C-alpha cells in the first residue's frame, strides 16, 4: 500500500516559534510510519521557507532545516519545488504553526492556493477564532454562557480600571485578544497587578481584554479526529 505523504509545516513568525518546533517533532515521533511518510517544511522567523531532512538525536527523530525553498506550484501533485531537479509530493498538509501566521487563516490560505487538502480549520474559522473577543461574542449570540469581560484598546485609563473593578472584580485574567492561547495572558489578584499586566499584554497587541476568573472550573480539550 502506498504511503501518504504528510507535509508538516512548522516554525513561523510568531513568538510561539519554538513551541511549534516542539509540536512538529512530537508529531514526527508519533505518526504511524507504516501508513504515512512525513516531510517537514520549516518557516523561519523572517518568513523564509526551508525544506528539512529527518535526523535522529538522543534516540528521537527531529526535523533539521536545510536549504531555502525556491517556489510553490499551485495545483501540482508535487507543489513544493526545492530546485529544478527536486520537488516534494504532498498528499496532505499538516500546519502546526502556532499563533500569528499559523492559526489565523494565513497559512490555510496559502495551502488553499496550492489546491491541496490540509488538517485543521479552514481560513474563515481560523481567522474568527484567533480573535478571542469576536469568538466570545459569536458564542454568546448562540446562547452559550461566557465569562464577563471588559475590552481595552491601545491604552489604559483610570475610568476603565474602575469599570473592571466594578464589573469583573478580582481575581481576573488579562489576555491579548488576537494571539496564541498562552501569549500575553496574566492573572491579576489586585489593582496593582491588573495595571502591570495590562501594560505587559499591550506590549504584544493593541487589543486586550480582562476576563473574570472562574473558580473550580474544569478545562476540557476536544480533538476532532475526523469530520
Regions found by a protein language model. Give the residues of each.
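ATP-grasp fold ATP-binding core
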Residues: 139-140, 165-185, 206-217
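ATP-binding N-terminal substructure of ATP-dependent carboxylate-amine bond-forming enzymes
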Residues: 1-124, 128-130, 134, 153-162
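Short, glycine-/small-residue-rich phosphate/pyrophosphate-handling segment
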Residues: 130-150
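Short, hinge-like loop/turn segments at secondary-structure boundaries
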Residues: 55-59, 137-140, 164-168, 191, ...
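Glycine-rich phosphate-binding loop signature in dinucleotide/nucleotide-binding domains
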Residues: 85-90, 167-168, 204
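Phosphate-binding site of ATP-dependent enzymes
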Residues: 186-227
Amino acid at each position: 500500500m502506498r504511503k501518504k505523504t504528510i507535509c508538516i509545516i512548522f516554525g513561523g513568525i510568531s513568538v510561539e516559534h519554538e513551541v511549534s518546533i516542539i509540536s512538529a517533532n512530537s508529531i514526527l515521533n508519533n505518526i504511524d510510519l507504516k501508513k504515512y511518510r512525513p516531510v517537514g517544511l520549516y518557516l523561519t522567523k523572517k518568513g523564509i521557507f526551508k525544506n528539512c531532512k529527518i535526523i535522529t538525536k538522543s534516540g528521537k527523530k527531529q526535523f533539521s532545516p536545510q536549504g531555502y525553498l525556491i517556489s510553490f506550484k499551485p495545483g501540482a501533485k508535487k507543489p513544493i519545488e526545492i530546485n529544478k531537479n527536486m520537488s516534494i509530493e504532498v498528499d496532505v498538509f499538516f500546519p502546526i504553526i502556532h499563533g500569528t501566521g499559523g492559526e489565523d487563516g494565513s497559512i490555510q490560505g496559502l495551502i488553499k492556493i496550492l489546491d491541496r487538502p490540509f488538517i485543521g480549520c479552514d481560513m474563515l474559522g481560523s481567522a474568527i477564532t484567533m480573535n478571542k473577543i469576536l469568538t466570545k461574542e459569536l458564542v454568546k449570540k448562540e446562547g452559550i454562557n461566557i465569562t464577563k469581560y471588559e475590552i481595552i484598546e491601545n491604552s489604559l485609563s483610570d475610568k476603565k480600571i474602575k469599570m473592571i473593578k466594578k464589573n469583573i472584580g478580582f481575581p481576573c485574567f488579562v489576555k491579548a485578544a488576537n494571539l496564541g492561547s498562552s501569549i500575553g495572558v496574566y492573572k491579576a489578584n489586585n489593582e496593582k497587578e491588573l495595571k502591570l499586566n495590562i501594560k505587559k499584554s499591550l506590549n504584544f497587541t493593541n487589543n486586550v481584554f480582562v476576563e473574570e476568573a472562574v473558580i473550580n472550573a474544569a478545562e476540557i480539550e476536544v480533538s476532532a479526529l475526523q469530520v
